[in-house]
Each structure stands twice: as structure tokens, then as C-alpha cells.
């Protein structure tokens, strides 16, 4: 990976030295860094959640993951997972107990939850598109962006015929960002105190490639996995591209200082050191 343009006028990322930290998987996705010092990521066809601790070999975090894709941690260190095969959202506590948080909307099964983020106050947001054979078994006639409240109530933030994919929050937790793989854009939603999203708008259009997962740094810049990792400002200005050896699916900031960007890309996971810290909600 080589960053082709600086992320901001005051920083130069023209020389980066990527490191392949895990490989020989089928299709990696859903990286999420735990404050306990390790990265969790999914191997979707392998039906596993993996755990990578720097300096150690990757290990199985959870076998038979029900087609896990996106992952996110909360303030209590619990792991939230989008299970595409079982079509549900689960939460795994630090003892390994798995709890189902969402699997239906108005009595109908979700399509196939894809990506998820948890705000500092515990509000949960996730995308629910349908790809491939999932489209043939759908019970809902739309793809959605959902919100789960503190009380476990599920609301639809947005409905569409096209497919939302990656999801992330601004550093202050007041803006929700969602990529759309069909429209090749990123939509932004202003969030209120209760987690609702009253103001929807297109922030970024005509992304090079098919946008997938995304993350945000502490300055509010967006890192979008597409043909490469495309970097945009919070205002939607394209700032640069992190060239990838394989097509990236997602990314996450990690390491104790949150200045490493972990990128899942096909069979492997890569790590790139940056001069900016990632924004995390936990």
C-alpha cells in the first residue's frame, strides 16, 4: 500500500510501509480493535472470527461464526457482530456469552446484516443489504439502515432498493456515515440525542470502485475501502488513496495508540502506520 496524496495539508503520508500481518484466508472482512490489545476480523467463507495479537500468530476467536461480516466493540469491551447466514445481530460478552439483539423487523427476518457501529452512549447502528443468493431468500422488500436503542427497540433509519454497506460515526458521534455499493456514494445522517437520524444527505459521490467498509480518524477524515482505501475530508473532499495489494473490503484503526490502520483485503490483513489517530467510540 502506498498513499498517493497527503491526508491533510499539514501531514505527508507519501511514504508508507505496509505489513502483511495475517494471510491464507478466503475472504477477510470486519476488522475491529479491542482495547485488550488484539484485532478481531472475519473470514466470511471460512465461517470464522479470527483474533490477531501483534507479535503472535492469528488464532480462532470464534468458530462457526454464522457468516460473520462486520464487527464493533463497545465501551464495556463487548463485541457486536453482523451474522449474515443467521441474518441477525449478536453481542458477545468478555466471557464468550452470545446474545441475539436483532433478527427481525416487524415479524420479517432481516436480509443479511453487513456492518455495524456502536456509539459511546450504547446506541447501535447497522446496515442490512442483500448480496448474491441472499436476494433470493429475502422477506423484506427493502435494504435498510437500522438503529437499536438502549431499550432494544429497533427502528429503520433509511430504506432503499440499493444496498447500504459500510457504516461509521464522526468523532463526536453526531453524524452517521453509510456507504452504498450500488450508488457508489457515502450518505451522512445527523443524529439526535435519542439516536434518530432526521437529516439525510449525499456527502461523497462517484467513488472509484465499489465502496465497502469505512472508518474515521480523529480529524474527521473518512477512510473508505473501495478499489483502494480512498481518503476524504469530513466535507467530502478527496484527499488521497492508499493503494492496496488486493481489493480492500474494510479497515479499522488499532494498536494501543490507534495510529495503525488495519485493512482487510481478500485473503489477507495488512497494517499501515499513520501519523493520525483513529476515532473510536469506546
Where are these predicted regions, by residue range?
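Blade/loop signatures of beta-propeller domains
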Residues: 4-17, 36-37, 46, 139, ...
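A short helix->beta-strand "capping" segment at the edge of beta-propeller domains
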Residues: 11-26, 56, 200-201
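Beta-rich, blade/repeat-based domains predominating
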Residues: 17, 23-39, 64-83, 88, ...
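Beta-propeller fold detector
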Residues: 19-20, 59-63, 99-103, 156-159, ...
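Beta-propeller domains
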Residues: 39-59
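Short, solvent-exposed loop/turn segments at conserved positions within beta-propeller repeat blades
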Residues: 44-45, 84-85, 131-142, 181-184, ...
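A short loop-to-beta-strand structural motif that recurs across blades of beta-propeller domains
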Residues: 48-50, 88-90, 143-146, 185-187, ...
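Short loop/turn segments immediately following beta-strands, especially the blade-tip
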Residues: 189-196, 274-280
